């Protein structure tokens, strides 16, 4: 376990355009944003990923996004956790990533919010 961190920063961001992408799945869209965020962060490899989502199990018939997206973007070996908090799911994922870094449990965490 690492020491407590006194400062947590956002090292990179990634976002897909807002729109109706009927030909892309939520996994495709989220993977694009994840890879862009990692690139923007200079290639820093996260040690944990938190995915904020509430509708995928019902709207896209796709549960367990966290573990699936870890594999989709080639980050196998780290935990991928889906966080659900209704309209605040993305914010809850960001908070979980922040607390993971602040606590010293990981040095880098990835927070993702996505709906389709």
Please place each PLM-identified region on the residue numbering.
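Active-site nucleophile and cofactor-binding loops and adjacent substrate-binding regions
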Residues: 80-90
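Conserved phosphate-binding catalytic cores of ATP/NTP-utilizing and phosphoryl-transfer enzymes
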Residues: 91-99
